[in-house]
Amino acid sequence: MSSFSLESLQDAAGPVSRETFDRLVAFEAMFQKWNRSINLVAQSTAGDVWQRHILDSAQLARIEPNATHWVDIGSGGGFPGLVMAFLLAERAGASIDLVECNRKKASFLQTVIGQFNLPARVVARRIKDSHALVPQPQIVTARALASLSVLLELTAPWLTSGARGLFHKGRDYRAEVQESVNRWAFDLVEHPSVTDPHGVILELSNLRPV
């Protein structure tokens, strides 16, 4: 198990306060209790939530250090959405909407938001029904949710209106990108993951149909 340290968090996310680090450590303990009941993440990764999930999510703050209006789709156990909520608490006026239709997972997300007074809101709807409920974001995130082509279909109402996507992807991301260009054109920046040697964060912008 990787050690919890402010340094590891700052290596992933950039400048982060000691207070935010302490809050994330408390969140990790709370997460472990809930995960034993409702299986928020696979048991194979539950023993290293700090490295595999929290730090993996936190690296988005380094990639985009300024945006204040975010939406995370298919938020599940809160990665990356809840982690970003903790980090966005350090940005004046920042907030994130968490779209999650599973009632138990939405309840978990809402409990964490209330416990830590996070700048976040749960949108308990299916993703395709959430667009009218979420003000136009600057950043859209998703992790371990769907193929890139499906993600683009789900997020097109936002990405074709000026938002950028930050999507965690694994070793097969190039095939997903190639599949997506049959339907969409977009600008793409590949950010190597700081936690997974085979992973990337795909930054997509200027989405338009072809």
Swiss-Prot record:
An annotated GO cellular component: cytosol
Keywords linked to the UniProt accession: Cytoplasm, Methyltransferase, rRNA processing, S-adenosyl-L-methionine, Transferase
Reaction(s) catalysed by this chain's protein: guanosine(527) in 16S rRNA + S-adenosyl-L-methionine = N(7)-methylguanosine(527) in 16S rRNA + S-adenosyl-L-homocysteine
Cell compartment(s), UniProt: Cytoplasm
Keyword set includes DNA-binding: no
Enzyme Commission code: 2.1.1.170
Protein family according to the UniProt entry: Belongs to the methyltransferase superfamily. RNA methyltransferase RsmG family.
Protein's name in the database: Ribosomal RNA small subunit methyltransferase G
Origin species: Mesorhizobium japonicum (strain LMG 29417 / CECT 9101 / MAFF 303099)
Lineage, top ranks: Bacteria, Pseudomonadati, Pseudomonadota, Alphaproteobacteria, Hyphomicrobiales
